[in-house]
Amino acid sequence: MRVALLTGGGDCPGLNAVIYAAVRKGINHYGDEFIGFLNGWRGVLDNNFIPLTLENIDGIQLKGGTILHSSRTNVKKIPGGIEKVQEVLKINKIDALIALGGDDTQSVTLYLSEHGVPSVGVPKTIDNDINGTDQTFGFDTAVMIATEAVDRIHTTADSHNRVVVVEVMGRDAGWIAYASGVAGGAHVILVPEKEIDIDHVCALLKYNYDHGKHYGVVVVAEGCHLPEVGQVIGSTQVDSFGHARLSGIGEALADLIEKKTGFETRSVNLGHTQRGGVPTAFDRVLGQRYGLHAIDMVHDQKWGRIAVLKGLDITDITIKEAIATNRRLDQRFFDVIADLEAKV
């Protein structure tokens, strides 16, 4: 078979590991031929691609980012987009398409599959919020990066008797905030699944000061809602999928904490550092397992389905199920946060 791959949406540690494993097994086990479209769906529309061979994928599983680059192109919103994709795939004699991406990218994959394009998906997001899978590659790396930052913030906050608010990624789900906050010993952990109670936040920080610890570390996910200001948007511009760029909840929260408590408060936004750099060993292994299953899905003609992790097994579900809702924290995780908080 002649198979095409692409990566869409934000980059993520482990993408290259998926590409590496899919191509390696496809060539060695199935005798496939591969191309990689550059810059996501934009590359398909522009017929812009590179060959993927055993030689030019050698060692890429160790690297961060994506060798295929990426974009946030929404084929569904481009007049004649679906027809153009079908034309390009036909010109290049493509038998199947493997799309690596989050819910936005996979919404396009599903659309194409429903319109006769043989395609399968691989879930990609550091937010770990794709429905139906226990963990996405890239999440472990993001948590490691965020945890290291929280560790470092402790010493500088302590040295200056300050409160420091650390803003991490997480538009709809607080997995990174939860994991890095717990691992990093944050005094306050705030996630999008629950509205921020500023009085409770301030009470927790005051408890620290009243009991001899004259500093505080707060971890907050970018998608959190603060009743006093709502959801903080970094830009009024939206991408082709209608998403505004979230940024600034950390700064808004820091200002409010300082105003209500009188404690000197600073904010740090970790931003894109969370999805940069080389993937952890766990994400390299997980990414390759996703890639191996993806090429098997192609040969089993499981069109319109997406690879997922269930327990210790890689299996697959329909893309429609995967993007129907976000995988979010529930009461079990709220209880962990509450049990580790000071009792105020």
What is each residue range found by the language model?
Residues G31-F37, T156-V163, H214-V218, A254, ...:
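Flexible, glycine/charged-enriched surface loops at secondary-structure junctions
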Residues A96-G101, Y111, P118, F139-A157, ...:
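Accessory alpha-helical/coil subdomains and C-terminal extensions
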Residues M1-L45:
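N-terminal phosphate-binding or glycine-rich loops at protein starts, especially the Walker A/P-loop
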Residues A252, R305-V344:
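Phosphate-binding loop/pocket of nucleotide- and phosphate-handling active sites
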